[in-house]
């Protein structure tokens, strides 16, 4: 993230009239432990899984089927916890036009490290599955915060030419799209220098 680092540490942001602060968002660590994706995906896919579950990627199917275990009262508790979490997040974010973070915290893994099981070597298949889920959780970590927030975001390419691509995520809460787009346009102009 050398280019993004220059944006934060260099004078280009100051020259553009921006002030960049490094802040802590403790509420990020307090987000509801059980996500919405599995129960909502299961609600949509459950009949398809019964009819043609073998046509699903086994890893995807396993994640979707976890949604069947959530009880209605747990889902309602989850919705309420999310609303409280959003309020805490917005309280911490309200004085900022937008927030900046890496879109993902790592560069893309080698496909061979996370390729689906091939059934030849059970130990290797298990290791690849474990690595897939570890990497997948990392790749979803930062964007999931914005999703749970019901926020808006975009990712600006900010890598040095010739290096693996990385993105700078510009984000905020719900209905802040215009501001996020305007801030992103200004950042994009700085990054293109």
Q: What is each residue range found by the language model?
A:
Residues 36-90, 155-165:
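Short helix-loop capping/hinge segments that flank enzyme active sites or metal/cofactor-binding pockets
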Residues 1-35, 57, 69, 74, ...:
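Gly/Ser-rich, acidic/histidine-flanked active-site/gating loops
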Residues 104:
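Short glycine-/small-residue-rich Rossmann-like dinucleotide-binding loops
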Residues 30, 34-39, 115-117, 169-171:
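Short low-complexity, flexible loop/linker segments enriched in glycine and/or proline
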């Amino acid at each position: 993230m050398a280019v993004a680092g220059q944006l934060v540490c260099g004078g280009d942001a100051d020259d553009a009239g921006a002030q960049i602060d490094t802040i802590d968002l403790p509420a990020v660590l307090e987000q509801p432990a059980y996500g919405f994706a599995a129960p909502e995906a299961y609600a949509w896919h459950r009949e398809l899984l019964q009819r043609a579950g073998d046509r699903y990627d086994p890893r995807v199917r396993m994640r979707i089927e976890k949604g069947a275990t959530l009880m209605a009262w747990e889902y309602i508790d989850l919705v309420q916890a999310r609303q409280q979490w959003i309020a805490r997040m917005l309280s911490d974010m309200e004085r900022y036009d937008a927030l900046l973070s890496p879109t993902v915290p790592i560069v893309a893994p080698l496909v061979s490290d996370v390729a689906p099981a091939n059934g030849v070597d059970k130990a290797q298949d298990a290791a690849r599955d474990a690595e897939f889920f570890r990497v997948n959780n990392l790749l979803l970590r930062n964007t999931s915060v914005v999703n749970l927030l019901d926020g808006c975001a975009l990712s600006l390419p900010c890598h040095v030419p010739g290096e693996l691509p990385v993105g700078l995520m510009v984000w905020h809460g719900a209905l802040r799209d215009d501001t996020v787009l305007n801030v992103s346009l200004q950042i994009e102009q700085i990054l293109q220098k």
